């Protein structure tokens, strides 16, 4: 009995180790892309030399830019820091050590190619365009395009950067009204890390009274402790100001809705079906082509053999006599049999 329990514990321990190993193996592969681009101001045609650092991550064929997910074949607009290389400050004047915020339009095209060693490689094409530096609208005369080749077996990535006029870019043709806006990922993570309250905001100096609250004796949890009205606020004006700000404050972000979860599930299902059909449909047509060619080829070969080596006899065919409705061969055999019987009878009569 004890040995059986030890065996069960060992099997359970091995299963846990396998699960942990598989969970740790699924790590995001990242690659840093440094882009040096030139932007022109739409107001006074000031030229800015800008350097942008983008962290591209790959996890389960999903693409992430600076921690934000990107949809293939779609334009995503996001904000990220940029470095001014020429020392000029933008019109807003709020740059710190040459760092300013810039608004980018990004488009990623994803496809699969096969290397010379018969390995399947993931091929990514990233197009980039700056439309705003700080508070100033800018234009980018030359579009940067980064080609990334990712080897899924060795987890190695190679990148090649190309620059060409914006008129030849597909990114500039797509209207900006269809862009998908992505907020800063760091802000989203900071908001999600906050403790979500289950009660409303109370008019206290520390309005978030439900965070890490310890219930007082005789009080229920998540209930504001009783305080004297004189100690709540330092002045009447402060009370009114805090009440107005709390009423206008937006609620904290909650968890994802069921609709967004369903949309993500349908999107993943669509990608899996697309990959399945792209792999199975060519194989199906190849099999059908082999079947059609085989049937047609066998028919042609049989016809040629019939022409070269014709058969002398056609077995299985009877030629009927229209008068007797009997085959000619059968008629001849019957006549022969009748003549034989008549000769035998005549011989017997003579002998008698």
UniProtKB/Swiss-Prot annotation:
Glycosites: 36, 44, 89, 109, 151, 197
Keyword Chloroplast set for record: no
Domain of life: Eukaryota
GO cellular component terms given for this protein: membrane
Cell compartments where the protein resides: Membrane
Leader sequence residues: 1-25
UniProt KW Repeat keyword: no
Biased composition (Basic and acidic residues): 225-244
Side Cytoplasmic, residues: 303-352
Name used for this protein in its record: Glycoprotein integral membrane protein 1
Gene name tied to this protein: ginm1
